[in-house]
Amino acid sequence: LVGSEMCIRDRGMFLINRNGGTALTSAFAAVPKTKKQGGHNQLQILVTERENYIASCQPKAKLPWRIIVVARNDKELADNDMVYKLAAPSRMKDISWIRPGKVAWEWWNHWGIKGVDFEAGINNETYMHYIDFASRHGIEYVILDEGWAVNLKADLFQIVPEIDLKKLTAYARQKNVGLILWAGYHAFARDMEHVCKHYSEMGIKGFKIDFMDRDDQEMVDFHYRAAEIAAKYKLMVDFHGTYKPTGLNRTYPNVINYEAVHGLEQMKWSDIHTDQVTYDVTMPFIRMLAGPVDYTQGAMHNANKRCYHSSMDTPMSQGTRCRQLAEYVVFESPLNMLCDSPTNYDREEECTEFIATIPTVWEQTIAMNGEIGKYITMARRKGDVWYVGSLTNWDARTLTLDLSFLGAGRWKAEMFHDGVNANRLASDYQKTVTDIPASRKLTVKMAQGGGCALKIYKE
């Protein structure tokens, strides 16, 4: 069983909390009464006092959907779109301009490029380097994360002098790459109409809006208004620092992704007791049921339990290299980040080229197997090509995949699997090309914290 909700416009979102045994209770965020600016870099509005009610609405207002999803087994939860189906239909007449894709992201790798003749950081030269990398690999976007706007001002029209956005936008356009801007929610909310109009006219393709960190009625309403006004100016929205999806991505399809997850960015500061690997094989059955997830995978520096440590400047993932590749298939993410630096990706060209080929939207999805907290395998099709991703927890695991859905014909698989030394050296992997047998059964072996990624195509 999984509980969720959708269509929560004009009222705070509820949470389900375990209360011992099988008992469940709900909690609602009350309406803010008094607030002040504060939080991370003065980018938030913090609630200092709340009212004694959870929503202010009209007498005949429609109530949100509250649902319980019942599945016969764990894997059915990993391919359930009830939240999307029950959400309000699209209010957008034209969605032809919405372009899902992958994003070269600089913040996780701390602008970590080497071998260049300029100082890497928040400046034109660095972002042109990321744009060049994205263009070479067919990556649709580059994001300018926190730092392009003047710190502590909460003003998206005050740009640091090292950045010339018009120049970068023009350069990216020449390279067939779009730019996405990060924004603290308070700075965005202060004048979102003006912000969206101005940056849309400049050629910006979307905003990654962050640090909402609330789910009361006022903040839920902000999400709707941000989606609506962004859509008016043909801008995509990626909500970070937010609550789980509740169907807004159906009502406004320009809402291209949500964070609302303990994603890979946590590895920059999480201690050795954080078990991200087990989380990775739990989240797809629960959180992903609500909607897409901006997990921000793609690390080329990988570590086992013994070697992992946090680092803000040179972060790493828990688990193997192939786990990172497989997550691009397992996790649903229409706007999918490449979290590592161009330097690290260029050094790992084989893995980078594979990631670059993986679509971000799909025509068919099959949850092949899985058990919450232990393992999962997802198969997804785009056109005539199938991608399959498997993840395991900290237990090494052998799975026999049933590929009977492929149908007739001769098929080949390009396969990235954990190397024989991956339990000790998490970045060890092997790439093989194999024929899919007539039995349509294929055995994959995963190391501790491992994964396996396949691209399957007809001969």
Where are each of the predicted segments found?
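Glycan-recognition and catalytic regions of carbohydrate-active enzymes
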Residues: D340-Y387, N423-S427
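N-terminal accessory beta-strand-rich subdomains and adjacent acidic, glycine-rich linkers
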Residues: S4-A87
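An acidic-aromatic substrate-binding cleft motif
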Residues: P59-Y141
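C-terminal beta-strand-rich structural cap/linker in extracellular carbohydrate-active enzymes
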Residues: V433-E459
